[in-house]
Amino acid sequence: QLCLLQPLGSGGFGSVYKATYHGATVAVKQVKKSSKNRLASRQSFWAELNVARLQHNNVVRVVAASTCAPASQNSLGTIIMEYVGNITLHHVIYGTGDAWRQGEDDEGGCGRKALSMEETVCYSCDIMTGLAFLHSQDIVHLDLKPANIFITEQGVCKIGDFGCSQKLEEGLSQSPHVCQQGGTYTHRAPELLKGERVTA
């Protein structure tokens, strides 16, 4: 039912692969067991499932998840998500990754076109729409950065990588430290940096 095709990338808590699941192309994240910080690894896996039942055009959809994995994989579990490609907003802004946005009107002198005002507005609207939806579901993404915004072939931005997210119970959080082990320090929410509780 699940067949891994090729690696797409890896991060602090696991690896992501392009795969097929029941014949459909998907992305598969295998959350690795961390010998140094098992609690953080577990938190990352369960945080990814905060969006498991949500469907929104600007949020990467979780298709399925399992905690069953062969011992040889050293994995806490597997998360199967919709495949949205491997281009992120980081690639678009900084011109990294695959040959992206190659063009003749190279404004920066580095072999890529600058984002147009129209693209900038469209991407911003997609991200804000996705965030507003997540907040309406009491979910806070605690590692929102260009590398976690995926851009589809149709040019739609989707928020992904929820390994450092939090579901606010009854609109409040009593644990500001939930994801301080993970996430990107330079993109961390101000309230986390101050040691305050997470807000939406």
UniProtKB/Swiss-Prot annotation:
Domain Protein kinase: 2-200
Amino-acid positions noted as binding ATP in the UniProt annotation, renumbered to this chain: 8-16, 29
Reactions performed catalytically: L-seryl-[protein] + ATP = O-phospho-L-seryl-[protein] + ADP + H(+); L-threonyl-[protein] + ATP = O-phospho-L-threonyl-[protein] + ADP + H(+)
Annotated GO MF terms: ATP binding; protein serine kinase activity; protein serine/threonine kinase activity
Active site: 143
Top EC class for this record: transferase
InterPro entries: Kinase-like_dom_sf, Prot_kinase_dom, Protein_kinase_ATP_BS, Ser/Thr_kinase_AS, Ser/Thr_Kinases-Pseudokinases
Name of the protein in question: Serine/threonine-protein kinase mos
Annotated source species: Vultur gryphus
